[in-house]
Amino acid sequence: MRGSSLGLYFILPIASGFFFDFNQRNQHEGQQPQVSYEDKVLNNDCADFLCPDTLTCVKTAKDCPCPFPKSQLRCTLPNGQFVCISKPATHDKNLNAIYDDPVKGPQSKIKGLRDCGWVQDAYKGIV
C-alpha cells in the first residue's frame, strides 16, 4: 500500500504539470478577442435584411442562404418560410448531382429519401 502511495506522490506533480502546460499551449498569443454575435449584428452595415444564421445581407428573408450550402438543401415551405436540411446521403452520382444543383436540388422529391419533397409532405402532415 505504501509503495503505491509513494508512486502516486511522484506521478501526480508530473501529470498536473502536463495538463497545466497543455492548457497554456492552447492559448494563442496575439489572437484578437472574439466579437460577440450581438456586436456583429448591431455593427453590421446591412441596409436590407440581415440573415440571423449567416449574417448575410439580402433583400428579403426569403433570400437567406443556408449556413452550410455544400451539405444542406434550402427547402421552401408553403407559407414562404424555409428550412435547411442535410442533403440526403447517397452513393448515386446522378442523385448527388441533382442535390448539388441549386435549382433542381430543392425541387427534388425522390421516394425513400428525406429531401425537400419529404419536407413538403411533412409540413402538410402526410408523412
From Swiss-Prot:
Underlying gene: LCL2
Organism field: Lachancea thermotolerans (strain ATCC 56472 / CBS 6340 / NRRL Y-8284) (Yeast)
Alphabetical keyword list: Signal
Family as reported in the entry's similarity comment: Belongs to the LCL2 family.
Signal peptide positions on this chain: 1-17
tRNA processing recorded as keyword: no
Name of the protein this chain belongs to: Long chronological lifespan protein 2
GO biological process terms held by the UniProt record: ERAD pathway
PANTHER family recorded: LONG CHRONOLOGICAL LIFESPAN PROTEIN 2
Described purpose of this protein according to its UniProt entry: Probable component of the endoplasmic reticulum-associated degradation (ERAD) pathway.
InterPro entries recorded: LCL2
